[in-house]
Regions:
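Non-transmembrane, aqueous-exposed alpha-helical and coiled segments at domain scale
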Residues: 1-171
């Protein structure tokens, strides 16, 4: 809202808010990262990610890697007033036989799909649902219907979990 005001546009004139979500998670710095992965699994995703991999642009430091987090993404979309989601770097996941997705958090033995306060977030363990991969290169595919079935199922699963329409996909 304040960005619009600074640009001379009243907030009520904004009709569409596009939130960009990567098909997997990465983070820089410390803090809770519920879906974080480690070791060879993280390194493989890190190296394949983005244009030059998931490394800091200035420092070259490796980013922390994780599976797509539906809980955090749903919360972020809600806070931003999202109307549409652009789902990016979907092609990066094409090497995987199976793709875990974080659909909830287990905190003190209870599962929630709502984003918790910080002290609860720090105790959260991921609840993962595993989807089949598509095992092929999808770069260059322009039409949604031309994507492999399992890729479309992954996108549709995430869309249902976060509760916001994925209207754009980049590969």
């Amino acid at each position: 809202a304040y960005g619009a005001i600074g640009a001379g546009i009243p907030p009520y004139e904004i009709k569409k808010v596009v939130t960009v979500c990567k098909a997997y998670s990465s983070a820089v710095g410390a803090g809770a990262f519920v879906s974080e992965i480690f070791g060879d699994e993280a390194q493989e995703l890190r190296v394949r990610g983005g244009d030059g991999g998931e490394f800091g642009a200035t420092t070259g430091r490796p980013r922390r890697m994780g599976w797509f987090d539906c809980v955090a993404s749903k919360y972020g979309c809600r806070l931003q007033g999202t109307t549409d989601v652009a789902f990016t770097v979907v092609d990066v996941l094409g090497y995987l036989d199976e793709i875990p997705v974080c659909t909830g958090y287990e905190i003190d033995g209870k599962v929630t799909t709502e984003f918790p306060v910080t002290n609860q977030l720090e105790k959260a363990k991921p609840v993962l649902e595993v989807l089949p991969g598509w095992k092929c290169d999808i770069r260059g595919i322009k039409k949604y219907e031309d994507l492999p079935e399992n890729c479309r199922k992954y996108i549709e699963f995430v869309e249902k979990q976060i509760g916001f329409p994925i209207t754009m996909i980049s590969n």
